[in-house]
A protein has these predicted regions:
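N-terminal domain-start signal
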Residues: 2-268
């Protein structure tokens, strides 16, 4: 066998040293190909490994079925507050926060955390989710000024989270809905609010402004819907569909409360 190899090397005009180098180079190339084939799939899923572990860790902090059953069995809101105050994530309730405000704050914080930790290719959708807190605060601010609440009363309605929280909080001392819209002139919501403001001034109901914010949020979500796989797309589309349904149901309820007929409701 060794003699045959030596004969082949001689026929090719190669010295033993050159032949050895070629053999080593061939093995290196094959090894490199194997490494690439093995590592490329791993690199594709690597950005998801840390987010998945962190999401699972947060999932482990969700209320258990037993805890939810015990909450259902409470007799009044005071018992609900006492029960939740014993859970670390909701201990703020014991410090004077209302249940609703605490839960809204936790939701906003969760959206912010997820938006920061997810891989870049799916981050846009989660960044839009994190806008929910700002939109909720703008709605609360508009509602407060529509009924003439003062600065302290308005501040109590705000959720202390969101990218624009400080800007919105500074507007708690303004006097009217028009002042709120003017104060948000440098934000991404300026155009949609300005376009809806004349309808509010005509009808004196907040529905046009609230609906404009909801539409902007859902349209932003649809624009950011691209995700890496078909399975993820299906999950996200299902969530988007539920968001649209909830927005439309809330809109119908608001419209009925404001005694609007179909022709007045349909544009929203």
């Amino acid at each position: 066998m060794a003699g045959e190899i030596t004969s082949i090397v001689s026929q090719l005009g190669l010295t033993p040293e050159v032949f050895l180098i070629l053999v080593i180079f061939t093995f290196v190339v094959i090894a490199a190909i194997v490494v690439v084939v093995v590592t490329v799939p791993i690199l594709k899923i690597y950005p998801y490994l840390n987010p998945i572990s962190r999401v699972r860790a947060r999932k482990g902090r969700l209320l258990t079925e037993k805890q939810i059953s015990e909450l259902v069995e409470t007799s009044d809101i005071s018992e609900v507050e006492n029960y939740l105050s014993g859970i670390p994530d909701y201990s703020d309730i014991a410090e004077g926060e209302s249940v609703e405000k605490t839960l809204d704050t936790k939701m906003g914080e969760t959206y912010d955390v997820v938006a920061r930790l997810v891989p870049k290719d799916i981050a846009p959708a989660f960044k839009v989710f994190s806008k929910k807190s700002d939109i909720s605060n703008i709605k609360s601010l508009l509602a407060a000024k529509a009924v003439g609440l003062n600065q302290d009363e308005t501040s109590d309605l705000l959720i202390p989270t969101g990218k624009l929280y400080e800007d919105i909080e500074r507007l708690t001392d303004v006097n009217s809905v028009n002042d709120v819209v003017a104060g948000l002139d440098n934000t991404e919501y300026a155009n949609v609010l300005s376009e809806a403001l004349p309808i509010y001034e005509e009808k004196k109901v907040l529905l046009p402004l609230d609906s404009a914010l909801d539409k902007y949020y859902l349209q932003s979500l649809l624009k950011a819907r691209v995700v890496p796989s078909e399975a993820n797309t299906e999950i996200l589309y299902s969530y988007l569909g539920n968001q649209v349904d909830v927005a439309n149901i809330n809109l119908i309820i608001r419209a009925k409360a404001d005694k609007l007929d179909y022709d007045e409701l349909e544009p929203y």
